[in-house]
């Protein structure tokens, strides 16, 4: 066993089970371990869904149980400037951003990494992400987590090999039930705590109410792809491609009782376009263009290559061909049509277990013949 006793690791303690068990595993590996709780959002309303106080108490209880110090830091200003404002801009433009990816890039593996190294003297940071790191020829690669159901590499594709080299992911080698089992054996307060969902650091508040505070909603018509007016939407920003719930429209004589899905957003005219059936041709894409590219462990690609892509989290791998258009953009052609490819979301590329990198979906290629010009 390598001597880790001189190495200091700061674990990002979220108040959840994954970071709790990560801290314990690192202690078992002989590291000097301390925790850091990041406050990244200033609550302004004191409502019960702001769970930061509960999360901090849980993180403190875990650190007390493990005999670890817990530091706290406030990154709310960095979060607002580098994550939240961009998030709002994307919604204003009719796109659907992924704030968790931006938060990992700007906060967890930038602000936190710098603070841990410079202020706390850390050799490494650690998080409870379900990913693995592999060092090859002096560069760190990002690998999928061992638990295919929980793999979170999709959210970490913006990391550089330099950032990865300073990061540890202890639970990436485990499956989730094993993580919970360890927490239960240790009698950690987080053992049965449910996994967090919702916007990174904003928690599980009602998304529509939350967004409406910062962006004025503009109600408008819901139209079918055939030009029928079937309802009203409360704001395009509340809807995303492929969405089924919350449309408030029933079946039609022509389409029967098949559920309605959002197939497009006409931002210029404030129209929400819908069609019936989850495989409606208007919902399908044969490819996409991705921009703001990031390759984890290498320079920009210069030649076409084969790989698989995910256009959203927990999606099945999609075989595709990636062709560079320039250093900042690639064209992706799927082997088979894919539903609900959404501009603003990320396309993330893999070869086997290795996450190569990804980019933001700029535009999608509709199924030929599905859109009337």
UniProtKB/Swiss-Prot annotation:
Claim: ATP-binding is one of the keywords in the record: yes
Site (Interaction with tRNA): 129, 345
SUPFAM superfamilies listed in its UniProt record: Adenine nucleotide alpha hydrolases-like
BP-aspect Gene Ontology terms: tRNA wobble position uridine thiolation
Active site: 103, 200
Reactions catalysed, as given in the entry: S-sulfanyl-L-cysteinyl-[protein] + uridine(34) in tRNA + AH2 + ATP = 2-thiouridine(34) in tRNA + L-cysteinyl-[protein] + A + AMP + diphosphate + H(+)
UniProt GO molecular function: ATP binding; tRNA binding; tRNA-uridine 2-sulfurtransferase activity
UniProtKB keywords: ATP-binding, Cytoplasm, Disulfide bond, Nucleotide-binding, RNA-binding, Transferase, tRNA processing, tRNA-binding
GO CC annotation terms, alphabetical: cytoplasm
Localisation per UniProt entry: Cytoplasm
Binding positions for ATP per the UniProt entry: 12-19, 38, 128
Region (Interaction with tRNA): 150-152, 312-313
Pfam families named among the record's database cross-references: tRNA_Me_trans, tRNA_Me_trans_C, tRNA_Me_trans_M
E.C. designation(s): 2.8.1.13
Positions of the UniProt region annotated as Interaction with target base in tRNA: 98-100
Disulfide bonds: 103-200
Subunit organization: Interacts with TusE.
Family: Belongs to the MnmA/TRMU family.
Function: Catalyzes the 2-thiolation of uridine at the wobble position (U34) of tRNA(Lys), tRNA(Glu) and tRNA(Gln), leading to the formation of s(2)U34, the first step of tRNA-mnm(5)s(2)U34 synthesis. Sulfur is provided by IscS, via a sulfur-relay system. Binds ATP and its substrate tRNAs.
Name of protein: tRNA-specific 2-thiouridylase MnmA
The species this protein was found in: Yersinia enterocolitica serotype O:8 / biotype 1B (strain NCTC 13174 / 8081)
High-level lineage: Bacteria, Pseudomonadati, Pseudomonadota, Gammaproteobacteria, Enterobacterales
């Amino acid at each position: 066993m390598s001597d880790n006793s001189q190495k200091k690791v700061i674990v990002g303690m979220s108040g959840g089970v994954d970071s709790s068990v990560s801290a314990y595993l690192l202690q078992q590996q002989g590291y000097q371990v301390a925790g850091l709780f990041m406050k990244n959002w200033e609550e302004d309303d004191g409502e019960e869904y702001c769970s930061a106080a509960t999360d901090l108490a849980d993180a403190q209880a875990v650190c007390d149980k493990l005999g670890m110090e817990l530091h706290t830091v406030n990154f709310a200003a960095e979060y607002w400037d580098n994550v939240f404002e961009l998030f709002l801009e994307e919604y204003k433009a009719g796109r659907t951003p992924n704030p968790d990816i931006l938060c990992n890039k700007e906060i967890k593996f930038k602000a936190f990494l710098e603070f841990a190294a410079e202020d706390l003297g850390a050799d490494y940071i650690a998080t409870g992400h379900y990913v693995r790191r592999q060092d090859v020829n002096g560069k760190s690669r990002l690998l999928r987590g061992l638990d295919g159901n929980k793999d979170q590499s999709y959210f970490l594709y913006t990391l550089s090999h330099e950032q990865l080299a300073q990061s540890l992911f202890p639970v990436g080698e485990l499956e989730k039930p094993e993580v919970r089992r360890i927490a239960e054996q240790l009698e950690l307060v987080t053992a049965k705590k449910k996994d967090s969902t919702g916007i990174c650091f904003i928690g599980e508040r009602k998304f529509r109410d939350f967004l409406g505070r910062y962006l004025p909603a503009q109600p408008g018509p819901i139209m079918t792809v055939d030009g029928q007016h079937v309802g009203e939407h409360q704001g395009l920003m509340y809807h995303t491609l492929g969405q089924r719930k919350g449309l408030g429209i029933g079946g039609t004589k022509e389409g029967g009782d098949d559920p309605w899905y959002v197939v497009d957003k006409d931002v210029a005219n404030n129209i929400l376009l819908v069609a019936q059936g989850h495989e409606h041709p208007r919902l399908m894409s044969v490819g996409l263009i991705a921009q703001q590219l990031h390759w984890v462990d290498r320079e920009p690609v210069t030649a076409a290559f084969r790989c698989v892509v995910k256009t959203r989290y927990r999606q099945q791998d999609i075989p595709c061909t990636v062709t560079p258009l320039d250093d900042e953009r690639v064209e992706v052609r799927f082997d088979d049509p894919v539903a609900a490819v959404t501009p603003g979301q990320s396309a993330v590329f893999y070869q086997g277990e290795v996450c190569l990198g990804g980019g933001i979906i700029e535009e999608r290629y509709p199924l030929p013949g599905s859109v009337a010009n």
